[in-house]
């Protein structure tokens, strides 16, 4: 059995330095020392989330090829950073780059920040040649079609480290998705289009394994939950949440809370034993379950599991990726759904929620644990956590299957405080203003065919999803403060042509 984690501690990124034997041993020793110093600065920086491992200077084609193959074979290695300290003839890199299957970042930097004007001689010029050595390297990457992120500047600069750290988080998300198994309990909500998708293509494209289990396989685990396991969870609920009086010990509906805890015990047992990192449920396919899972889903998402409602495995994958990519950062990531609008001119905003399953990592407050009727599903009233999402910057991201490819759409948003309390709304919720404005955002979202289920992340911004999509060679459309509907519509049309051509090539 394996416990879920979002930690990046078991991952590493290799730091590669290119040169050639032409320079001689003394210069190559300087190259090694200075590249180790660059790697050390990255490794010790608090804003670099993944361990950086320096590798010996690469000087010939065979060593480069072997390094790429070693990286491919290492489960710990989630990507490579390369820098051409001197001039490294790029034909030496062809076999290695062609074989490489890991995310790649080209760091265009140099050892020194300022030029030592009064002492510069030809020895200095020969040693510090990244300004044109990296141009040679950039050419061969483009010639080979290598997908990479290019970062320019000295590693002592915060913006440079931020870009590298963001790419590392995207690479970690990519690694997590590649080892991800998704358990679907039942199938999609009947007749819904956007939650469907090609699971075989997803395994080829993203590495994720998506399969279905009968809901009653889960029911067996729920029914097997012991009183001791349930008691332990109820104790935890009492520590963490404000429990409604009727659900408290001795309350008239306390048994409903205990059954909610049994669902959590059973779900966690099933997921851990199967090595799953994400799951879906459907209110139309509940088998012997007495409640639609709500509280259990919320708490498992908070631990790092991906989740999709109504069989939506694509959103479950995105949420798991977002959880890993946001590891260690304040905020959270959750299933979200655009529900209804506030359309007062000048005040336009969106009220988002779901039936039950919003992750409590979106709040720093103390959620209330409540029970209310649910008009669909035909089961007992489910227990759930109720709270308001913390105000602040966020991004909402969706994935759609566009037949010949997957499309990711991201909207930059600002979560805002509620205008008034919502005493009669019995679910967790968020209110946000989308960029650039609601009308443009919604029209662009509809134009893109983006899904109604999203992941909302308050931990990471849109750049990490841009890097993730680039690594995955997957279409990404961004709606932000610079978006115009006219320009966005053109981009959608251009993308259709580009991605179809790219697949053919």
Curated annotation (Swiss-Prot):
Cofactor: record remark: Binds 1 Mn(2+) ion per subunit.
PANTHER family recorded: L-ARABINOSE ISOMERASE
Top-rank taxon: Bacteria
Positions that bind Mn(2+): 310, 337, 354, 453
Name of the gene: araA
Alphabetical list of SUPFAM superfamilies matching this protein: FucI/AraA C-terminal domain-like (SSF50443), FucI/AraA N-terminal and middle domains (SSF53743)
CC cofactor: Mn(2+)
EC number: 5.3.1.4
Functional note: Catalyzes the conversion of L-arabinose to L-ribulose.
Family, as annotated: Belongs to the arabinose isomerase family.
Pfam families for this protein: AraA_central, AraA_N, Arabinose_Iso_C
Signal peptide coordinates: none
Gene Ontology cellular component annotations, sorted alphabetically: cytosol
Organism: Clavibacter sepedonicus
Pathway: Carbohydrate degradation; L-arabinose degradation via L-ribulose; D-xylulose 5-phosphate from L-arabinose (bacterial route): step 1/3
GO MF, one annotated term: manganese ion binding
HAMAP family assigned to the protein according to its UniProt record, in alphabetical order: Arabinose_Isome
GO terms (BP aspect): L-arabinose catabolic process to xylulose 5-phosphate
InterPro entries xref list: Ara_Isoase_C (IPR024664), AraA_central (IPR055390), AraA_N (IPR055389), AraA_N_sf (IPR038583), Fuc/Ara_isomerase_C (IPR004216), Fucose_isomerase_N/cen_sf (IPR009015), Lara_isomerase (IPR003762)
Catalytic activity: beta-L-arabinopyranose = L-ribulose
Keywords attached to this entry: Arabinose catabolism, Carbohydrate metabolism, Isomerase, Manganese, Metal-binding
Name the UniProt record assigns to this protein: L-arabinose isomerase
